[in-house]
Amino acid sequence: MESNTIKLTQFSPAAGCGCKLSPETLREILTPVEIDALEDSTSPLLVGNSSRDDAAAIDIGDGRALLSTTDFFTPIVDDPFEFGQISATNAISDIYAMGGHPTVAIAILGWPVDKLAPSVASSVLAGARQTCREAGIALAGGHSIDISEPIFGLAVSGLVEIENLKQNNAAQHGDTLFLTKPLGVGIISTAIKHGKAQRDDVELASESMRSLNR
């Protein structure tokens, strides 16, 4: 199938972040497993899994921390190039959310090679590369597997001054909440999958999801 005729969302059981495990299931998986070392006072780990932040943070000295995050999901739009852009934006923006700046990214690609042509995956990667270029970082490699449904995302590294490190548990009563993007893209992505989204709404949602949260 050619990339200009396929509808990627039809190969996805749930659009975008809708394919995440439920909090209950994730808690059941993680509870028996110790996956960070914050209890160890000698560990350079500043932010691990316990606070459910957007990225892990490791003290690398000189007042700076290395940020590490990964994010991938099933198609949230039908256009392969835009899917790559949105996936890359989602992963890179986790670094910005922690107060840092991205330095490098590597790709995570799962592709049903018996259902979707390699050229479609190339379009996804091209979209991601464009977004990485916009963020000023290289898409420096990655890993791919043959699976039954398409997934794509990035693992991204970044740097942050520790004094500027932002965590999601620091909000105080009375703080002002700023939204950097409008709400509702999840509803629109579900409508896309079911063929019920209006073209103007799709374009607005895609533009929002492709915009880096810098």
Where are these regions (language model features)?
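Helix-biased detector of long, well-ordered alpha-helical tracts
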Residues: 1-214
